[in-house]
């Protein structure tokens, strides 16, 4: 048996809930996993991304902050893929991505991210969003 078959067998043996996501830097492994077990949500981790995402046979992409391009994210979403950004740990970066079209943020600062997300939900008027955008632009 190969790695993917062993993984699927262990995944099923452990009765892991299919709401969990599985990701790897190895696209071929993820595409094979997607083909053999489409019920498992698969993702491709891309440390450095230039241009679009292509048409990988996975459910989502994970890009590093440095490589984030909003247009590429929107295109990926149009083709049915989710996009997550990692590892976002500063207040400034969390502020930026909470208001972005990404499907999720990977962070070590979970409490801070939740607080920022809640604050953005509470203060979400057009003026609030404008001021946040202005603040992020000035901070750069």
PLM feature spans:
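Short loop-to-alpha-helix "cap/lid" segments that border enzyme active sites
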Residues: 1-140
